[in-house]
C-alpha cells in the first residue's frame, strides 16, 4: 500500500520512517517533506502544498490513506476536503482543529464547558493591536 504523510517537521519524518518499516507499505510519500526525508530511500518527498492538487495526487497515485501532522493544513480543511472526495485521511476536521489552531476558539470552548483555564481577553479592535507589544507581570499576549 501507498501512504501520504503531510508535513515537513520531525514528527512527520518520524511517522513516515515508522510507516515505511511495515512490510505492507510499498511507498511513503511526504508532502512537502524535509532534508531528512529526502535522504531516506524508503520515502519520497512530494513538492505539493495546494490541498486540491494534493488530493489529485492521492487519487492519481492510488494512495491508501493520508496522515496529516501540522496545524496549518488541518486548519485549512485538508481532512474535510479529502473526506468530501472519498479519500481516507487521519486527522481532525477543520472545525475540530480549531481547538489547536485558534486560541480564541479554544479559550471560549473551555469556558463554555467549565474546563479550568487562565483568564483571557480577545481583542478585535485595530486600536488594541499593539497589545502584543506590551509586557508586564501577569500578561502573556497571544495571537488568536
Located regions from the model:
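Active-site nucleotide/adenylate-binding loops and adjacent lid/helix of ATP-dependent enzymes
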Residues: 4-5, 100-144
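ATP-binding N-terminal substructure of ATP-dependent carboxylate-amine bond-forming enzymes
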Residues: 1-95, 100, 105
Amino acid at each position: 500500500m501507498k501512504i501520504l504523510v503531510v508535513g515537513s517537521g520531525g514528527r512527520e519524518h518520524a511517522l513516515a520512517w515508522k510507516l515505511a518499516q511495515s512490510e505492507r507499505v510499498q511507498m511513503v510519500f511526504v508532502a512537502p517533506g524535509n532534508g531528512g526525508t529526502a535522504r531516506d530511500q524508503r520515502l519520497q518527498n512530494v513538492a505539493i502544498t495546494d490541498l486540491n492538487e494534493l488530493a489529485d495526487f492521492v487519487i492519481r497515485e492510488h494512495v491508501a490513506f493520508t496522515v496529516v501532522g501540522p496545524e496549518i493544513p488541518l486548519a485549512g480543511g485538508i481532512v474535510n476536503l479529502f473526506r468530501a472526495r472519498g479519500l481516507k485521511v487521519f486527522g481532525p476536521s477543520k472545525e475540530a482543529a480549531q481547538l489547536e489552531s485558534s486560541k480564541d476558539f479554544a479559550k471560549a470552548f473551555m469556558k463554555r464547558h467549565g474546563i479550568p483555564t487562565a483568564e483571557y481577553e480577545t481583542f478585535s479592535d485595530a486600536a488594541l493591536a499593539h497589545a502584543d507589544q506590551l509586557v508586564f507581570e501577569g500578561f502573556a499576549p497571544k495571537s488568536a
